[in-house]
Amino acid sequence: MQKARIKLSSTKHEELDSVCNQIKAIAEKTGVDMAGPIPLPTKSLKITTRKSTDGEGSSSFDRWTMRVHKRVIDIEADERTMKHIMKVRIPDAVQIEIELRS
């Protein structure tokens, strides 16, 4: 039986968790084995910019942070289950990658 590894990433963890819950419900409904969702470490991307563009005045800075949340789900990939997973509505903020393994 083939296995599928589903990798999900997003900057909005609420939407990411809702997609994970939908996939989990599909796996329970179809009765296939599933491992996950496994939370991976959150990446923090930081950018510091100077507020004053002309170089005059005091040195004050803005700090911008973006957090990227990731989840991994391993699931048995039978045809019926994969069709249901492909029909799940994925928000724009969530990126999904499906890798099939034998």
From Swiss-Prot:
Domain of life where this protein originates: Archaea
Gene3D superfamilies: Ribosomal protein S10 domain
Name of protein: Small ribosomal subunit protein uS10
Any one cellular-component term (Gene Ontology): small ribosomal subunit
Function, as annotated: Involved in the binding of tRNA to the ribosomes.
Keyword field: Ribonucleoprotein, Ribosomal protein
PANTHER family: 30S RIBOSOMAL PROTEIN S10 FAMILY MEMBER
Species this protein is from: Methanococcus vannielii (strain ATCC 35089 / DSM 1224 / JCM 13029 / OCM 148 / SB)
Disordered: annotated span: 37-61
